[in-house]
């Protein structure tokens, strides 16, 4: 597929949004555990991807689909940040993230937009086995990271 100059520019914009996740710190570790240098959203996402890849293969789920969902699950935070549940209502968080996600995905080639929005909505709805698996991976990664911070002396 040959991309037009504007499509290439849009992809660069999309990838910059992805890379921005490296700069966004996971706020829960700062506010609840006083971690001085917490993991970034990108750190969290990478750990989740590795855990999701291995565990979905072990229990024979659709690993490719789960990997896409895992990669997309926190992408909107590049625009809206890592909001704490006590700072913003769940409904407001979903609205903000949905608006951000639509804007982010609009930079992708048209044949990917609907596919990725469907996966994002599946994750938000949390009604499929894949979505429940990814939500559980969020919790597992957080528990493992908490243990790491505990080893470092945080409580």
Q: Regions from the language model: what does each represent?
A:
Residues 1-155:
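Active-site helical microenvironments for divalent-metal-assisted chemistry
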């Amino acid at each position: 597929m040959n991309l037009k100059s504007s499509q290439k520019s849009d992809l660069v914009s999309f990838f910059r949004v992805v890379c921005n996740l490296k700069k966004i710190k996971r706020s829960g570790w700062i506010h609840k555990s006083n971690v001085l240098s917490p993991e970034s959203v990108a750190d969290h996402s990478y750990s989740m991807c590795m855990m999701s890849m291995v565990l979905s293969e072990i229990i024979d789920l659709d690993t490719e689909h789960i990997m896409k969902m895992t990669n997309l699950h926190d992408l909107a935070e590049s625009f809206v940040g890592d909001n704490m549940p006590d700072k913003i209502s769940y409904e407001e968080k979903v609205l903000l993230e949905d608006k951000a996600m639509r804007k982010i995905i609009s930079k992708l080639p048209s044949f990917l937009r609907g596919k990725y929005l469907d996966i994002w909505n599946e994750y938000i709805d949390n009604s499929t086995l894949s979505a429940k698996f990814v939500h559980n991976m969020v919790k597992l990664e957080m528990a493992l990271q908490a243990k790491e911070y505990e080893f470092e002396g945080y409580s």
